[in-house]
């Protein structure tokens, strides 16, 4: 995966596992929908039908954003993924991938049908289901990715985020000061971060994964493979219009004076199977109020409603950092305007943007830089940065360092590199599914 090559790995945390897990979830949703339909779609099961539709849409969304290119002007030509709407009744069925445009149209249809049916009253543990706010947060993210040439999608992002955030978003954001005040040792901060009772967490999902063993700075693997001083300079140790790293409520983990980087947010839990054998799993907040706020800020920016965008950015930074100064559109613009664009030799947080839509130089671009920077901090090691890289056509490099000296650039992924769509699992291709194209 590091080399952007196809992997034959089929174990936990592989593309194969993600593909299977998503389609298993889709199969469950389709079975529920079929059973409800067989009963005549009674009103008493409307909420369950709504959640099944949202679950089906979400799992196809995960697959599309992983194995397809970002939605854009070529979406009607780019390869999609099979959108399954019925329970499977045959062995080894053959499906067409369709196009990205068709996948997004189907997701939108499922969302719009399912959203008004969601009813939180049917759940005993609301945060472990696609409750109303979680469903609308998903809709906000989806329509942000479903970019239209005239940005008509952005008003839907705003409308749906408003349902999540209400009239005073600040009261629903994570209490980062309280999280940062907790001990960074043991699992105290991560357990608090994923707590379903936290007001910011809208949907908490469990997943069979060893990812926290790599991403948690409490483990040596993080420093070696995931986050070090070089990468931290662009994320958890970076400076923004809110100040330097000392302004963050949650500081990079540094027990015993040893160098550690990254915020402690995810932790691995062990489920013992037999003897000393165990399976790792994790909990993570798939949707949060903070992320919904940044979705809205980005939509405001694309619509050139800069004062409203700056107000959302300011609300986020006052929760996430210790900075008490109000950020205006002017202060945000000035900060990112003076930064140089990233190069492998001189990295900065400001990357050249090459989206499949038009953004203006100056205020609009610099507000986008700020939002991408904030989202990178907010969702560090949770996977959303990759979506921003794809959506904004950010060029990324594979760099070889000796100590802190850049020795060589071993690979480069350009804006239109087909490897931005991760290759389908080898077993899926062997079974007859059309693979993603490659240049070699």
Question: Could you tell me what each predicted segment is?
Answer:
Residues 2-68, 94, 98-102, 111-123, ...:
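Conserved, well-structured interaction surfaces
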Residues 355-440:
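C-terminal functional modules
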Residues 64-71, 122, 145-151, 302-304:
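Short coil/turn linking the two alpha-helices of tandem helical-hairpin repeats
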Residues 66-109, 150-159:
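Short coil/linker segments at helix-helix boundaries
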Residues 26-29, 104, 111, 154, ...:
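Inward-facing hydrophobic residues that define packing positions of alpha-helical scaffold repeats
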Residues 285-306, 312:
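C-terminal substrate/ligand-recognition segments
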Residues 154-290, 323-358, 378, 384, ...:
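Hydrophobic-face positions in mid-chain alpha helices that act as interaction patches
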